[in-house]
Amino acid sequence: KQLRDNTNVFDWFPGDHPAMPEIVAHRRSPGVDPWIGSCGWCHLPNGKGRPENAAIAGLPVDYFLRQLSDFGNGARKTADPGKKNTAVMSGNAAGLTDEEAHAAAAYFASIKMTPWIKAVETDTVPKTRNSGGFFVPIEGAGTEPIGQRILEVPEDPEAAEVYRNPRSGWIAYVPVGSIKKGEDLVRGGGSGKTMACTACHG
């Protein structure tokens, strides 16, 4: 029961990050209007997020605040009508005070984002089930062709699904040849099909 109680963020490694502001560490008390969930429950105390939401560590404060504003006023939406947590995010953003928004923005901006997704090229992937917006391998179910998908799964399903472990990484299964195609796109625009990513992003 405690593992599913999102009143308080699971902070297994408090030494990995600065002290969390109240809005990052705890949701508002029941009965307080409006109800606001804690930022760290979904995006984790280190801001790395998970496949069902987003990594927000290291985002500039101004950009962070603009995204909150866009979520809150309805300017930012999702292309997937079945993605329920977008509505949760929009409601949270709309209900934040300016003080809470700035505290969260400054906190996550102070944390450096580090890689925790490993790309693995493959022809087959584990059969999976959806667990609240991300995919978890089904034990004993075997594999299936990857096709043209990119499939992200946790390295340790129990650590991610049950304990929300912010140190437990993810595997991104991709079709064979994807990494070279990605490099070509970044460095040369995909054989001239478009602008190289490095032209803007370095």
Question: Residue locations for each model-derived region?
Answer:
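Short cysteine/histidine-rich zinc-coordinating motifs and their immediately flanking basic loops
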Residues: 50-56
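Carbohydrate-interacting regions of secretory-pathway proteins
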Residues: 201
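Extended intrinsically disordered, low-complexity coil regions enriched in Ser, Thr, Gly, Ala
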Residues: 57-86
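Primarily extracytoplasmic ectodomains and periplasmic/lumenal surface modules that are beta-strand-rich
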Residues: 48-49, 63
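Cys/His-rich metal-chelating microdomains
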Residues: 45
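Flexible coil segments in periplasmic/lumen-exposed cytochrome c-class electron-transfer proteins
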Residues: 1-37, 41, 76-187, 192-198
